């Protein structure tokens, strides 16, 4: 690979001190790096000379990043920043502990079916969110799936993978690993749609179940197999795999894209249904445990005052007009950050937050007179978007509850209006943490036939602001007696009214625009479906519903919350 044959450990790259080479691939090298401006440890991907000098790639990467920026899906790994320094493109990402699925399969062999289904479902959630936003991944494979110790799965390399053409991948030698998961239409002149990602995810499911990709051999034979060979049956490869998985794999890997599942969620649901009843419970438990697990906090490292670094060039490229400074530079004042969720990362131990920043190229504009704000305390109340809802609470809260509601359900409104204030107080006091879930099963009872989904989408737009108190306020406001629509009413609420409600509780313009544009409708549909499945796992018959981690809470007892938090 050009430009990165030798490790650059111990050297400086702009404001980044490259500490350790942690990954190397066809598109670039990945380093554990110290960001000396923001005083944190990150994963830094340095793109190869070939890609960095390719104006088409540069343009596509910008475009794909903007598209991926609409994603607010917890299983998509985001980046902190990207740009160009000294003519080399880079991507700055959060560094956490984890292992890619390919390494896990090499070490452990095939996964138990419940675990395989749980991992594929999480990746399917990420892909469905991307597809709803008009983005495709194009390189779904075990190497691009990161699994934490708690089996929380992340899909990486969004933006980079889709910005790179198949021809470029071939030139860089990346196609060998990718071929095992490429849909037949990608080998022809046919236009590949998002269903190529569904095909690839099905191949990943097959490999998780059996320990090997569906087709093996040299490049030409694998390509030919994808196009012409019969779809293999996992039950004949590994004893103990339910025969029902044969049909799941056959549909997901159908040669004709139109014969495949419509969404990755459909694939995941079919895979879950193929499990034996006991294994379905195990898969649900794996998902629940992975979602409850606290996401790791990025590590930091003290930085000496007066650190020296070369300044970056603007994204437009060109020969840098300056050299390294002759004296220490002050910390630069930066322009306001443009908040986006750029879903792109690398095959290393990475995990992401929800709101991420694409900064304008920083410029030195004089010394700063104040120190940077301290990081929040480790026990601070935080917000995390989950596969089926939103977590609000502190890591030290002794009790975590699940609350399920439907936006036009009258008893749900009564429940929230009665207890929201006390719940908020308990969360602020770190006595309680809450996983909020919103469902949409009453859509057809609303005047617009989709109000519940629109309300769920609005809640995720607000969650994207990453403000726990704001989210809880908006969730409660949806059920206000002067706002909540009723079943079979002559009217419900418009997107403009939902946006105004968000504005009244303090949402920023980005969240308001998200609501008005309907950007999160696909995410809402997926997450509401996931929430319904989670609710079904508790054998609940409807909403409102409260679960304390071990049993159903009788919320009709006025003292239920006091009893719960002692």
UniProtKB/Swiss-Prot annotation:
ATP binds at residues 22-30, 45. Residues 296-330 are annotated as: Disordered. Residues 16-275 form the Protein kinase domain. Keywords: ATP-binding, Cell membrane, Kinase, Membrane, Nucleotide-binding, Phosphoprotein, Serine/threonine-protein kinase, Transferase, Transmembrane, Transmembrane helix. Signal peptide: none annotated. The keyword Signal does not apply. It comes from the Bacteria. The chain crosses the membrane at residues 338-358. The keyword Metal-binding does not apply. Its main location: membrane. Coiled coil: none annotated. It is a single-pass membrane protein. One of its GO terms (molecular function) is ATP binding. InterPro entries: Kinase-like_dom_sf (IPR011009), Prot_kinase_dom (IPR000719), Protein_kinase_ATP_BS (IPR017441), Thioredoxin-like_fold (IPR012336), Thioredoxin-like_sf (IPR036249). Autophosphorylated on serine and threonine residues. Dephosphorylated by PstP. It holds the Pfam family Thioredoxin_4. One of its GO terms (cellular component) is plasma membrane. It catalyses: L-seryl-[protein] + ATP = O-phospho-L-seryl-[protein] + ADP + H(+); L-threonyl-[protein] + ATP = O-phospho-L-threonyl-[protein] + ADP + H(+). Residues 1-337 are cytoplasmic. It is found in: Cell membrane. The modification Phosphothreonine is found at residues 11, 50, 59, 170, 175, 178. Belongs to the protein kinase superfamily. Ser/Thr protein kinase family. This is Serine/threonine-protein kinase PknE. It comes from Mycobacterium bovis (strain ATCC BAA-935 / AF2122/97).
């Amino acid at each position: 690979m050009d430009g990165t044959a030798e490790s650059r450990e111990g050297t400086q790259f702009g404001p980044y001190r490259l500490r350790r080479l942690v990954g190397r691939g066809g598109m670039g090298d990945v380093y554990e790096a110290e960001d000396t401006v923001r005083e944190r440890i990150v994963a830094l991907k340095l793109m190869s000379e070939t890609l960095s000098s390719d104006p088409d790639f540069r343009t596509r990467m910008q475009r794909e990043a903007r598209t991926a920026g609409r994603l607010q899906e917890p299983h998509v790994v985001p980046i902190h920043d990207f740009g160009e320094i000294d003519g080399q493109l880079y991507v700055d990402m959060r560094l956490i502990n984890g292992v890619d699925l390919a390494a896990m399969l090499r070490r452990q062999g095939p996964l138990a079916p419940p675990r395989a289904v749980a991992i594929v479902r999480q990746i399917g959630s990420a892909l469905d969110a991307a597809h709803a936003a008009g983005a495709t991944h194009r390189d779904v494979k075990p190497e691009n799936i990161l699994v934490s110790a708690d089996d929380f799965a992340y899909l990486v390399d969004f933006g980079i993978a889709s910005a790179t053409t198949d021809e470029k991948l071939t030139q860089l030698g990346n196609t060998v690993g990718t071929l095992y998961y490429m849909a037949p239409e990608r080998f022809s002149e046919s236009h590949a749609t998002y269903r190529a990602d569904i095909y690839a995810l099905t191949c990943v499911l097959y490999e998780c179940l059996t320990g090997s990709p569906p087709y093996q051999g040299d490049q030409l034979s694998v390509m030919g197999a994808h196009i012409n060979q019969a779809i293999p049956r996992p039950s004949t490869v590994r004893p103990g795999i339910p025969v029902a998985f044969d049909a799941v794999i056959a549909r997901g890997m159908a040669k004709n894209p139109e014969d495949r599942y419509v969404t990755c969620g459909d694939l995941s649901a079919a895979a879950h249904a193929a499990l034996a009843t006991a294994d379905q419970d195990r898969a649900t438990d794996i998902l629940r445990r992975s979602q409850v697990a606290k996401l790791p906090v990025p590590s930091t490292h003290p930085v000496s005052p007066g650190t020296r670094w070369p300044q970056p060039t603007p994204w437009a490229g060109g020969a840098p007009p300056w050299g390294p400074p002759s004296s220490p530079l002050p910390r630069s004042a930066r322009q306001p950050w443009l908040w986006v969720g750029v879903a792109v990362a690398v095959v290393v131990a990475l995990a992401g937050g929800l709101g991420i920043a694409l900064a304008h190229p920083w410029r030195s504009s004089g010394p700063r007179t104040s120190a940077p704000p301290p990081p929040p305390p480790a026990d601070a109340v935080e917000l995390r978007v989950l596969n089926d809802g939103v977590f609000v609470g502190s890591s030290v809260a002794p009790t975590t509850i699940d609350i399920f509601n439907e936006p036009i359900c009258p008893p749900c409104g009564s429940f929230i209006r009665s207890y929201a204030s006390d719940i908020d107080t308990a969360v602020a006091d770190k006595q309680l943490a809450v996983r909020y879930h919103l469902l949409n099963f009453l859509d057809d009872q609303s005047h617009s036939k989709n109000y519940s989904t629109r309300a769920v989408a609005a809640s995720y737009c607000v969650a994207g602001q990453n403000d726990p108190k704001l989210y809880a306020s908006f969730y409660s406001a949806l059920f206000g007696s002067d706002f909540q629509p009723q079943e079979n009413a002559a009217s419900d609420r418009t997107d403009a009214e939902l946006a105004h409600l968000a504005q009244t509780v303090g949402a920023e313009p980005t969240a308001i625009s998200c609501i008005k544009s309907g950007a999160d409708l696909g995410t809402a549909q997926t997450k509401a479906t996931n929430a319904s499945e989670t609710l079904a796992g508790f054998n609940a018959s409807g909403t409102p519903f409260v679960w304390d981690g071990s049993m159903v809470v009788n919320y009709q007892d006025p003292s239920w919350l006091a009893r719960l938090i002692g």
